[in-house]
Amino acid sequence: MGILLALLPAIAWGNILLVSVKMGGGAYSQTVGMTIGALFFATIMYVFTQPALTMTILIVGFISGLFWALGQVNQLKTVEKLGVSTTVTISTGMQLVATSIFGVIAFREWTTTTTIILGTIAILLIVVGVVFTSLDDKENAQPPGQLKKGLLTLIVSTFGYLVYVIIIRWYNIDGWSAILPQAVGMFVGAVVLTSKHKPFNKYAIRNALSGLLWGTGNLFLLLSLPRVGVATSFPLSQTGIVISTFGAIVFLGEKKTKRQLIFIALGSVLIIGGAVLLGMTKA
């Protein structure tokens, strides 16, 4: 039962970008719509769980949500440039590397020879995986400069996601307590970042569904942690990239050559393998 719970976040999160693209709209309306759904879900969860909310939790959770919005809107902007299958694998790899390196520097996570070796191998696997998934073929190449623009946008996205995760951990805030203030920050951040682009339209409403998926994944992650631990739940939650990557090719019709498909598959395996090793360093 615990393993099943730990897999559910991957299923939910792995479908977010697929659903978002299917619902239509641009990155701005998609981001706002996602936060509407997430805020609705978080409000319901707060009513049922009613965790204690101190001023620190409210402020830090809100700031965390603001940076999530920065990460999400830039990830969706990258999807418009590179497509879901390429964006999600590179984005996942960048996030894993960034959070791991920051964890070592700020929280001194890798303190033994074993964890240092495992962590180093994990990062190397993830980096190679990212390179594999971003390879182009001449017959299916990105327009000149498109990949570079996408990668630069993803760096901004990764920074947003990094602060979103790290600040909660820095202040040692429980996930249940953070849900509502984070969701409020996500919504406010999305509105501020997209206000010039008139994001409130029918596509924003449709994309509330992707926000509900995000909330569902978050819920199952919190439920699985006490049952299977971080070392198991963390890598399992990252396997959603398989759903996103190949779902985009199958259901969204993203065109890839045979060579690209092989390298995307290899890259996904390497990134997941790296995530598993990172999970072992957290054991």
Curated annotation (Swiss-Prot):
Membrane topology: Multi-pass membrane protein
An example Gene Ontology CC term for this record: plasma membrane
Keywords: Cell membrane, Membrane, Sugar transport, Transmembrane, Transmembrane helix, Transport
Transmembrane segments: 4-21, 26-48, 52-71, 84-106, 110-132, 151-173, 178-195, 208-230, 234-253, 260-279
Source species: Bacillus anthracis
Protein name per Swiss-Prot or TrEMBL: Putative sugar uptake protein BA_0200/GBAA_0200/BAS0200
Superkingdom field: Bacteria
Family named by the database record: Belongs to the GRP transporter (TC 2.A.7.5) family.
GO MF annotation: an example: carbohydrate transmembrane transporter activity
Protein location: Cell membrane
SUPFAM superfamilies: Multidrug resistance efflux transporter EmrE (SSF103481)
Taxonomic lineage from the root: Bacteria, Bacillati, Bacillota, Bacilli, Bacillales
CDD domains linked: glucose_uptake_GlcU
